[in-house]
């Protein structure tokens, strides 16, 4: 049976860590004309809530599945995998990535997050739409799982670097998948320097324009992650520059369709964020809090001796009891310790 025509194609654009106040300022200063045009022709909702913890892997999985971490099983930026008896680190910082192993961290982020960690009991938006024969497309987004097999890119100029980092295996993703030069289902001529910050939004804009020009999707997840990296460097009140870069990526897509009016004749657009940010004025050192406990180290020479695994993740942290025979006592002691730490608002 032929697939019934869709009324409009949908573009879901996600600007990582976008602050509404900064979006308003970027528009006011004339730095975001594409976003302004979309806002003026649509509905602008400023008071949205993110998931908890509000970090990118958890929020990305929530957006892709419609579920919270208890159901989609991506619990944090850093967590302890009981089945494999090790830490999982998705790249919370360069220092953390080095501590837990660069190759391991990259492999967990690119492969395991989708193929092993993300719950199989909950379908992603790509799987739902693939099942309905709706053409899906995805740029560099953490959660890309779908039904289409993609082998690593053979055309990328970064192929040898990718192979050296163990990116040699296929994945299953959206029908059209473009992930940081590692996977590209079409020869678009677009590159992102292996997903380097500052290049990813431009890559998304380039790929998006190609997909629109060639009519290759019904649903496109248009990922714009560079605002997050810029915010960490310049502060959350310095987003105007990175919002302008995200706007240019959107403008490329609109331009290739003949302008905003022509684009909106055939496309519906949702622009959103996964979470936002605030300035960090104080920090909590969990290593000091648990100085008297035997905490599992990233490359622990004697892991069986560890009592606790401690997993900080910027806005929250998780503590795991590793000694099954003393789990109850260890959890109670950890909760008491954390309740006395200045800066810890909630222990659950």
Descriptions of predicted regions:
Residues 12-15, 49, 138-142, 223-224, ...:
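Glycine-rich, histidine-containing beta strand-loop boundary motifs that form or position
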Residues 17-20, 53-54, 69-70, 142-147, ...:
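Short, solvent-exposed loop/turn segments at secondary-structure junctions
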Residues 27-30, 152-156, 235-239, 283-290:
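Short secondary-structure boundary/capping segments
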Residues 6, 15, 46, 53-55, ...:
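Secreted, luminal/periplasmic, and some membrane-associated catalytic domains
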Residues 4, 198-220, 227-269:
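A long, amphipathic alpha-helix that forms part
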Residues 67-233, 321, 339, 346:
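His/Asp/Glu-rich, glycine-adjacent segments
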Residues 24-78, 137:
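Short, structured active-site-proximal loop/turn typified by the sulfatase FGly-forming signature C/S-X-P-X-R
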Residues 21-22, 44-49, 120-129, 203-208, ...:
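Short alpha-helical segments and helix-capping/turn motifs at coil-helix boundaries
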């Amino acid at each position: 049976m032929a697939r019934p025509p869709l009324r409009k194609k949908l573009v879901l654009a996600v600007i990582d860590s976008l602050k509404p106040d900064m979006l308003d300022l970027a528009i006011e200063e004339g730095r975001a004309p594409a976003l302004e045009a979309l806002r003026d022709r649509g509905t602008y909702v400023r008071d949205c809530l993110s998931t908890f913890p509000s970090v990118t892997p958890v929020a990305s999985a929530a957006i892709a599945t419609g579920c919270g971490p208890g159901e989609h099983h991506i619990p944090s930026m850093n967590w302890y995998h009981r089945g494999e008896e090790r830490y999982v680190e998705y790249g919370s910082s360069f220092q953390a990535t080095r501590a837990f192993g660069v190759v391991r961290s990259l492999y967990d982020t690119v492969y395991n997050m989708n193929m092993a960690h993300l719950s199989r009991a909950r379908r992603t938006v790509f799987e739902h739409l693939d099942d309905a024969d709706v053409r899906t497309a995805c740029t560099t987004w953490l959660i890309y799982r779908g039904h289409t097999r993609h082998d690593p890119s053979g055309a990328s100029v970064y192929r040898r670097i990718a192979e050296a980092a163990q990116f040699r295996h296929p994945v299953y993703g959206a029908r059209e998948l473009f992930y940081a030069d590692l996977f590209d289902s079409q020869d678009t001529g677009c590159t992102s320097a292996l997903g380097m910050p500052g290049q990813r939004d431009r890559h998304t804009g380039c790929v998006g324009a190609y997909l629109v020009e060639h009519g290759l999707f019904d649903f496109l997840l248009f990922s714009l992650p560079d605002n997050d990296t810029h915010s960490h460097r310049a502060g959350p009140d310095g987003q105007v520059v990175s919002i302008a870069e995200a706007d240019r990526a959107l403008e490329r897509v609109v331009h290739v369709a003949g302008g905003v009016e022509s684009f909106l004749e055939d496309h519906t657009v949702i622009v959103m964020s996964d979470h936002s940010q605030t300035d960090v004025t104080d920090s909590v050192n969990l290593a000091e809090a648990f100085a008297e406990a035997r905490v599992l180290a990233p490359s622990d020479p004697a892991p069986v001796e560890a009592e606790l695994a401690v997993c900080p993740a910027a806005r929250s942290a998780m503590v795991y009891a590793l000694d099954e025979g003393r789990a109850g006592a260890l959890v109670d002691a950890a909760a008491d310790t954390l309740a006395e730490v200045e800066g810890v608002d909630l222990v659950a």
